[in-house]
């Protein structure tokens, strides 16, 4: 009987093999489940091979498949995977032990499974034993393995359905909580939007208040600047007025000085004219003297010859020249005396020119000062008008600002109150959201736990399903083997029937020979004058077949009392019973439907063989032994009744050989066959499909 090892296989490198069976049926796919330890990175170059137990090298594998790489792996948790070995590559059935080995890409063995075999299933492998304690007495039940697997599968399916219902309920709760959270988030978003709008309004009012305050400050600053400018302009006007007065006084003094200088200049001009006249006169005299000197020199040149004559005249002339030289020196001295006067006159003229220029400049400056004063007065008037306008505007702005400030304070109070209410509402919503998030987190953790448990149960169910499929495959293989054996038994049965027909012919031939010998013996006895009733002899002569018994035997029976009494019992020592035909007993009234009731034919053959005697049974079924003889002996009474009447009896019930359940004889034969197939859980489709 095939047994599965549900315990984890020992591993060298941490790889564990799960649900490794002790035996596998050949010509069927083998599914290998294994678990990679945490921290192991699976690779597409890793492979799982089927090795002989004594194999010492990784190259001594019988077959292998590449390992499957999971799409998602979780750090810190083991990784489950499975591979399938195709039926065409599996070893032949035998006593050789094999094992799975996980080999990584470096060629190192990371894990191996317990040993197992490949062999054909035995008939007893289809049954399992269950021990139950009921009322203190131990009961040993033998049931088909398919039934146990079906019950386990039903329980797993029921548990899976319960978990799925629980999962659906949790998902509904999570959906409701999410909808509640979304509603609260929408309300929170609305409150936040209102709060943001109020904040924007508050910021706008604060901004407008700040702008008004800045404008007021700017206007106040401008007013201060204008007042300072007015004061500065007034100071400048006063300073300009003082400067104008000083300039006027200085101008008067300069005018007086200019007048004095003009008079002095006129006086100096008069003196200069006199000096010039004197100079001109002196120059004229000097010119005259020079002309005279030239004339005298000429005369002196003319008179050189007469020098002696005119010595006295020359001396006189020398004196006159000396006198003229003295006069010329005096004139030159007077001219030299006139030079400082010329310089003084020139300085006075320059001073007068500079005074005139200064006076012109002072006039121009005075004119510009007067224009500046006029402009300053106009600007002062305009500034006073602007200051008055600014003061009026400032008063209006102050009044508007006071009104805005009152309205702002009211709005600020209302906004603060609404903000406080919104804050309280937001705090409540935050607390509600935190509580809901905590609830959702708990639900998520619980859902994750249920999902993990469901995944674990699903993996277990898948493993059990694969095990059940494997068991079902083995059952199908066993059923195919049974069908082959049944076909072989049918062939043997046909051969046995053929042999029985031949044996029947032989038995009829032997019976005819014995009957002929008996008839000859009786004729001899009749001839010898044996005493017999005449009526009896006449009846025997008329119908000798009436002496035949309804039952038949192949040999003489020691106990003659078991046979019915005959008319010749007192005179005959040996009774030869004419055997009834075996073929009619086997075929019965429904000979055409013998192929449809094969089990009844086998029972009829066995009962006929047993009723005819142990020697005949040994001749007919030498290879079956005494087991079938004992089973068939239980039907001896019905067989004898059939033999006594000469008509095969139809059984009133059809009985299942496994559970002994009875079916009416007139019921359809398919009902019994379907009932028997139900014990083996045989179906062409998979019984369960897990989604």
UniProtKB/Swiss-Prot annotation:
Residues 515-604 are annotated as: Disordered. Functions as a coactivator for aryl hydrocarbon and nuclear receptors (NR). Recruited to promoters through its contact with the N-terminal basic helix-loop-helix-Per-Arnt-Sim (PAS) domain of transcription factors or coactivators, such as NCOA2. During ER-activation acts synergistically in combination with other NCOA2-binding proteins, such as EP300, CREBBP and CARM1. Involved in the transcriptional activation of target genes in the Wnt/CTNNB1 pathway. Functions as a secondary coactivator in LEF1-mediated transcriptional activation via its interaction with CTNNB1. Seems to enhance inorganic pyrophosphatase thus activating phosphogluomutase (PMG). Probably functions as a component of the calphoglin complex, which is involved in linking cellular metabolism (phosphate and glucose metabolism) with other core functions including protein synthesis and degradation, calcium signaling and cell growth. It comes from Rattus norvegicus (Rat). One of its GO terms (cellular component) is nucleus. Part of a calphoglin complex consisting of CALCOCO1, PPA1 and PGM. Interacts with the bHLH-PAS domains of GRIP1, AHR and ARNT. Interacts with CTNNB1 via both its N- and C-terminal regions. Interacts with EP300. Interacts with CCAR1 (via N-terminus) and GATA1. Belongs to the CALCOCO family. It comes from the Eukaryota. The gene is Calcoco1. Zn(2+) binds at residues 656, 659, 675, 679. This is Calcium-binding and coiled-coil domain-containing protein 1. Residues 145-205, 232-339, 417-514 form a coiled coil. Residues 1-30 are annotated as: p300 KIX-binding. It is found in: Cytoplasm; Nucleus. A zinc finger (UBZ1-type) spans 653-679. GO terms for molecular function: beta-catenin binding; chromatin binding; RNA polymerase II cis-regulatory region sequence-specific DNA binding; sequence-specific DNA binding; transcription coactivator activity; transcription coregulator activity; zinc ion binding. Residues 45-125 are annotated as: Interaction with GATA1. The modification Phosphoserine is found at residue 4. Its main location: cytoplasm. Gene3D superfamilies: 2.60.40.2840, 6.20.250.40. InterPro entries: CALCOCO1-like, CALCOCO1/2_Zn_UBZ1, SKICH, UBA_autophagy_assoc_protein. Pfam families: CALCOCO1, SKICH, Zn-C2H2_12. Residues 1-190 are annotated as: N-terminal AD (CTNNB1 binding site). One of its GO terms (biological process) is positive regulation of gene expression. Keywords: Activator, Coiled coil, Cytoplasm, Metal-binding, Nucleus, Phosphoprotein, Transcription, Transcription regulation, Wnt signaling pathway, Zinc, Zinc-finger.
């Amino acid at each position: 009987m095939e047994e599965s090892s549900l315990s984890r296989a020992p591993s060298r490198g941490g790889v564990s093999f799960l649900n490794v069976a002790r035996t596998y049926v050949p010509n069927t796919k083998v599914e290998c489940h294994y678990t990679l330890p945490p921290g192991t990175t699976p690779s597409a170059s890793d492979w799982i091979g089927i090795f002989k137990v004594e194999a010492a090298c990784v190259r001594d594998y019988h077959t292998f498949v590449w390992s499957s790489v999971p799409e998602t792996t979780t750090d810190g948790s083991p990784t489950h995977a499975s591979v399938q070995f195709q039926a065409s590559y599996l070893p032949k059935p035998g006593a050789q032990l094999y094992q799975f080995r996980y080999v990584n890409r470096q060629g190192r063995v990371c894990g191996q499974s317990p040993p197992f075999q490949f062999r054909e299933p035995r008939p007893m492998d289809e049954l399992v034993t269950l021990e139950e304690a009921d009322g203190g007495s131990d009961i040993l039940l033998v049931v088909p393995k398919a039934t146990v697997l079906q019950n386990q599968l039903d329980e797993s399916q029921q548990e899976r359905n319960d978990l799925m219902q629980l999962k659906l309920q949790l998902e509904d709760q999570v959906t409701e909580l999410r909808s509640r959270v979304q509603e609260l988030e929408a309300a929170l978003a609305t409150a936040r939007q209102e709060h943001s709008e109020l904040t924007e309004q508050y910021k706008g009012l604060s901004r407008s208040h700040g702008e008004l305050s800045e404008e007021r400050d700017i206007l106040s600053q401008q007013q201060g600047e204008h007042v300072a400018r007015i004061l500065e302009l007034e100071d400048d006007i006063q300073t300009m007025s003082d400067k104008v007065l000083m300039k006027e006084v200085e101008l008067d003094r300069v005018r007086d000085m200019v007048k004095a200088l003009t008079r002095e200049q006129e006086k100096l001009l008069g003196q200069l004219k006199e000096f010039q006249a004197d100079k001109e006169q002196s120059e004229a005299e000097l010119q005259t003297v020079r002309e005279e000197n030239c004339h005298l020199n000429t005369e002196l040149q003319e008179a050189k010859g007469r020098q002696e004559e005119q010595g006295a005249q020359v001396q006189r002339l020398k004196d006159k020249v000396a006198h003229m030289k003295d006069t010329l020196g005096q004139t030159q001295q007077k001219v030299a005396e006139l030079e400082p006067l010329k310089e003084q006159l020139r300085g006075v003229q320059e001073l007068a020119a500079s005074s005139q220029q200064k006076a012109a400049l002072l006039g121009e400056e005075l004119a510009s000062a007067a224009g500046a004063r006029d402009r300053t007065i106009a600007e002062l008037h305009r500034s006073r008008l602007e200051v008055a306008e600014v003061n009026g505007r400032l008063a209006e702005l102050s009044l508007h600002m006071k009104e805005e400030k009152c309205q702002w304070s009211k709005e600020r109070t209302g906004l603060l109150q609404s903000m406080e209410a919104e804050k309280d509402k937001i705090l409540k919503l935050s607390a509600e959201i935190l509580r809901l998030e905590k609830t959702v987190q708990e639900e998520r953790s619980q859902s994750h736990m249920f999902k993990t448990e469901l995944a674990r149960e699903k993996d277990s169910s898948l493993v059990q399903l694969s095990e059940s499929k494997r068991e079902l495959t083995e059952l199908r293989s066993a059923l195919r083997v049974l069908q082959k054996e049944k076909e072989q038994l049918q062939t043997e049965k046909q051969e046995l029937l053929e042999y029985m027909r031949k044996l029947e012919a032989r038995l009829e031939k032997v019976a005819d020979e014995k009957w002929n010998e008996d008839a000859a013996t009786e004729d001899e006895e009749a001839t010898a004058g044996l005493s017999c009733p005449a009526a009896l002899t006449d009846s025997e002569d008329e119908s000798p077949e009436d002496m035949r018994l309804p039952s038949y035997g192949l040999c003489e029976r020691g106990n003659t009392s078991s046979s019915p009494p005959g008319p010749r019992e007192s005179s005959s020592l040996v009774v030869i019973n004419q055997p009834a035909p075996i073929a009619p007993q086997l075929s019965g009234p429904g000979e055409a439907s013998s192929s449809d009731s094969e089990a009844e034919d086998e029972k009829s053959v066995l009962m006929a063989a047993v009723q005819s005697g142990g020697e005949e049974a040994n001749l007919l079924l030498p290879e079956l032994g005494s087991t079938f003889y004992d089973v068939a002996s239980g039907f001896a009474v019905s067989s004898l009744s059939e033999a006594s009447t000469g008509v095969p009896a139809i059984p009133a019930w059809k009985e299942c050989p496994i559970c002994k359940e009875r079916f009416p004889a007139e019921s359809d034969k398919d009902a019994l066959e379907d009932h028997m197939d139900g014990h083996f859980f045989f179906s062409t489709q998979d019984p369960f499909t897990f989604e």
